[in-house]
Amino acid sequence: MERRRLGFLLLWCFMCMTCQAQKNGDMPFSVVIRDGSTGEVVWYVNALLLDADSAVVDTLKCDRVLRKSSMEYEYSGILPKSGKYILKCTFDRLFTPLFFPFEVELRKSQRMVRLPDLFMKRKDEPQAQMLQEVEVVATKLKFYFDKDTVVYNADAFKTVAGSVLEDLLKKMPDIQLKGNTILYKGNPVRNLLLNGKDFFNRDRHTILKHIPPYMVKEVRVFDKKEDSNSLIKREREMRGLTMDVRLKKEYSTFFLGDATAGLGTDQRYMGQIFGLAFSSRMRLSGLASLNNVNKIPVMSYEESYQNWGGFGDCARDNIQLRYNLDEPLGLYSLMGDVELEYKDDLVTRRTSEIKFYQTGDVFGRSAFNGRTRSFDFSTNHSFNFLGNTIWDFTLQPSFRYSHVKNRDSSLGATFEKDVFSHLGKGWLDSLSLPVLTEPLRSDAINRRTVEEMEDGHSLDASLRLDKDLTWKQAGQNLQFSLIANYKENKHRTYYHGNVDYYENPSLSSDRRNNYNLTKYNKRGIEGAISYKRKLGERNDVSFIYRSSHSSNEDNRALYLLHLLDGWEDSASHPLGELPSTSELFSTLDGANSHDYQKLQNDNSLNLNYRYSYKENRQEKYGVSINIPLKLYHEKLHYSNQLIDTTASRTNVITRVDASFSHSTLGEKPIKLWFSYNFSQSSPSMLQLLNIRDNSDPLVITEGNPHLKNAASHYFGLYLSKRIPYGDISFEANHQFVDNQIATSRVYNRLSGVTRYRPQNIDGNNTTRASVRWNGRFKRKGKIHISNFSNQWSVHLNKNVDLSTTEENTDFTQSVVRNRYLTNMTGIGISLYGILLVTNAEVEFRHSTGNSPRFQDINAWKVQIGNTIKYEYKSWRASSEIKYERYWGYNHSPMNKGLLLCNMELVRKFSKCDLKLEVYDLFNQYKGVDMYVNGQGKIETITNILRRYLMFQLTYKFNNKK
């Protein structure tokens, strides 16, 4: 009893001491003092804290601390109580004395008071006044600090005629551009503003490539906090590292644009017209383009070109429109885009395939030629109304329509042996003969020729309503959303096919003329409510509840036109021709046609907890746990000639996401991150039905009512450390899946028919690990290393599939283990104004399998790429040289070395640009790919854009100049 009383007494004394200490104050505070001319931090100033009567309260100490990922000097002291104070800073030899009065009210919830950065004014220097030759214009200050904002003076950076904003930013200290990603001191810029407006943050390419430097007054970089004074809701919620490009007064409103035309060899062409109008309230930009060089014109975050490594030969016509409109009082804020595109794509593909079976592998070759023409229209909008009131809400309508026409032909055959190894390039001619000759005929299983035509459209429309309520003082946020959507697909497919059987003479050739009509539509509505609350400075919790209802309808009608007299011959009835309605209905394949309707109700609850411990605004420890729970009920009615059934199920899907992070502070920080993910997936209702589809003469698909849910486990680890010459990091992850839903395969060696059925399989897993060094070097002199990186990575994959042949009764697990060892090295060197970037990749692949006839794969891939850029006044030259070499492919044309070269030469003028572009100078590029799993190996070569040379002329216009 006495011990308990003594304990209570000590606790009471401790609480009294704590309360008295809080009452008396003793609150630490800090401040950074800078040179007002250079913005550099100074550590040699005498700093005193004075009270309102100028009596000395404390002498400030200067220490090195971590601020915004770098070490800086910071002055610190103690505030004894709430009240008025004066901060006195002196250094007589260099600065005039600085007196900074301030008032502070101490609160119990505070840990520290941070004063704004102070800037000391330098004393006048007589020597500088005597130098008459030095003019202010010639020595413009390139940048200075305005409190926590760094301000770059645009006129202090010289650019040549025809330059654009990205050229100006590249000349500014501490700013780097990687594509359209902007970095300031290595940290990505989250918000890009133009005159304080974020109209172009989602399509930075628009202003980086088109705003000329002469329009820019200054560039401001700062860490934006939540702004409660803005009348526009979007701007109030903006936060993070921000770059604001401020225009000169005469360019606060403008209209500019450019037009480009290009003609090249091999009938290549491109044309483009761009326009941009801007004011403090609105932005309107448009782009119209056409080309047949596989280029994708975009006004988006990253410009994308498909012709360096892309497949196919594509002509594209495109029109894009983007707009922003902000009402000055914040009553409404509108933004959106509209895009129309027409594509004409030609694809040629050659495939070599090996299928693994215990009774012997099966070899195949095929050729595909296709043409796809498509028209797409899409539009997306976001309308915020009453954004300056508590009644604000946001509407987001979207719509997309696509119409596609395909015409393709294919030829393929399967064999008992690899009979193509000695045929070389003549294999396709031998396969195309009306009658197969020896040695192909004796080892052939079947040969198939197909002509197919498709015509269809798809439609996707949705409308979203969002509303949120925020209580900042309580740290609470409540959001509501309601989404309605509609999807529709309708496709007509015409098929002429012929299959010849060689292994089994009793099977006659299969000739088909089919017409397939499919219709699909889906209607759905979803409501969601989310709540987030902060529990002190370090903890926050949130939950999201979603409820949705959807209905699907799918109809397929397959007509066997070859059953009609005279319709078996494709010559008399070409592809796309249909008989009369009565004759058409008489050929309906009821066993392979179907109608089904599905109703689904989903309810999910997502629980999230996050802990974050920070020191000096940097997170030192972080824990995140996310647990989504999903309960859904499905009801499916499926009917055709053979089955009419209704099925339903109720299922619960769980998931767990957990992560832990730790960071140390200092000059050589260490970052550690670990994550675990558990997720479940369930088979579709159609997979669970006992149905059979044999509409394809060589493929039969079946359902499996005994499928189980699959479960995936993922472990991730990341570790990085700052070293004297850069950063070194280690990353590893491992994933394995229980009851993975795969497709089993039963093969008939006499006909070549394969029967597929979904099955649960265990044993699939993937492991990856990599070590990377990113070098950091000081850029000094005319010769220096701008960047260096080296990465070693290992990828281990175990793929398990089920396959057998009809003469066997049991399935056999086919296991293939793929092992990859990769090294990637990159280095950038600046040599007297010439930038040389070299990237090298070496990959070794070793694959083994448990099949008795599986031949181990030892394949090498070597890629060495060099980019050379040089600028001299208004001339710019660049070249991309890439060498690729492959070994270990069965298909001999793939085992070749390729030397690839792209070149550009640009001459810039104030009003126009001239450009010479050379693509694939040596005409050697190929689209090569290889895929291996437990069921087989596939090697493909796909056509790509061929060599061309193009001249381009760009004319620029601006209403202010």
Spans of model-derived segments:
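Short, polar/charged loop or turn motifs at beta-strand boundaries
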Residues: 149-172, 194-199, 261-265
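Structural motif
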Residues: 32-43, 140
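Short Pro-Gly-centered beta-turn/loop motif in secreted/extracellular proteins
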Residues: 68-86, 160
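Primarily recognizes Gram-negative and organellar outer-membrane beta-barrels
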Residues: 202-205, 225-267, 281-723, 727-961
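A short, solvent-exposed loop/turn motif at the edges and junctions
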Residues: 55, 78-80, 84-105
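Periplasmic plug
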Residues: 181-226, 242-249, 282
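A short, amphipathic beta-strand motif
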Residues: 27-36, 118
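Short, acidic, small-residue-rich periplasmic hinge/interaction motif at the N-terminus
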Residues: 48, 90-92, 112-155, 177-179, ...
